[in-house]
């Protein structure tokens, strides 16, 4: 029963998970896609393509026209608990479908146990009018339009290690303002607008220990 309750708790966590939304409450936006005056890319450069995995077995799958975030969930329990598990699922063909969120789980028997597995795939980036990619100083800059302004993520690849930089804190803002001629503008108490020049943006990306950097090791070419 404990495993059953744990599994349902895990299912709830999976159902509540958002695609790459690690921070909330403080936001920095750019007036225009970064870096300004640089041409937009029409595809992801070869250097950045591949499948990368972090220490939590989260995958970043970078293809020519799209970047996906993938997570695999597995849970094993005794087959005697299957009747209890079934109350939260519908059996459709050879898969169990969650009544909570319609997630689909494959299953297999392993001796006296049964294993449920599920793959969550979220779109990290795709070329749209509201999502644009540019490149500067060897880094890939992903721009995401939110209403009329833009948020960014910066990606670099060095020695088969993918690094994704998130800029999100008040301390980050102070360091950015120290580099720019035009200081940030407060839109509301937790939202600031940035207008760096191209060279200033390049310097921002190269600041040491700016924001948080997540690392993924390359496990496969695309």
Regions found by a protein language model. Give the residues of each.
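Short beta-strand-centered aromatic/proline hotspots
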Residues: 61-65
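Tryptophan-anchored aromatic micro-motifs
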Residues: 47-59
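Positively charged n-region of N-terminal signal peptides that target proteins for export
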Residues: 1-4
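C-terminal motif of bacterial Sec signal peptides marking the signal peptidase cleavage site
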Residues: 12-15
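Calycin-type beta-barrel ligand-binding domains and close structural analogs
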Residues: 17-45, 66, 70-78, 83, ...
């Amino acid at each position: 029963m404990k495993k059953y309750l744990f599994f349902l708790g895990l299912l709830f966590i999976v159902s509540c998970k958002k695609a790459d939304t690690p921070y909330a409450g403080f936001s920095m936006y750019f007036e225009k896609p970064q870096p300004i005056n640089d041409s937009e890319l029409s595809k992801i450069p070869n250097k950045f393509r591949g499948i990368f995995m972090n220490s939590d077995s989260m995958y970043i799958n970078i293809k020519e026209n799209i970047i996906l975030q993938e997570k695999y969930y597995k849970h094993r329990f005794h087959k005697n608990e299957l009747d209890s598990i079934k109350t939260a699922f519908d059996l459709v063909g050879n898969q169990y479908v969650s009544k909570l969120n319609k997630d689909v789980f494959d299953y297999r028997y392993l001796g006296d146990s049964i294993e449920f597995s599920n793959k969550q795939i979220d779109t990290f980036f795709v070329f749209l009018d509201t999502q644009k990619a540019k490149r500067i100083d060897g880094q890939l800059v992903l721009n995401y339009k939110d209403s009329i302004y833009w948020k960014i993520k910066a990606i670099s690849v060095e020695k088969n290690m993918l690094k994704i930089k998130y800029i999100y804190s008040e301390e980050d803002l102070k360091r950015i303002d120290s580099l720019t001629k035009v200081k940030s503008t407060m839109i509301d108490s937790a939202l600031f607008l940035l207008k760096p020049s191209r060279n200033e943006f390049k310097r921002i990306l190269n600041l040491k220990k700016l924001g948080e950097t997540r690392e993924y090791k390359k496990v496969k070419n695309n």
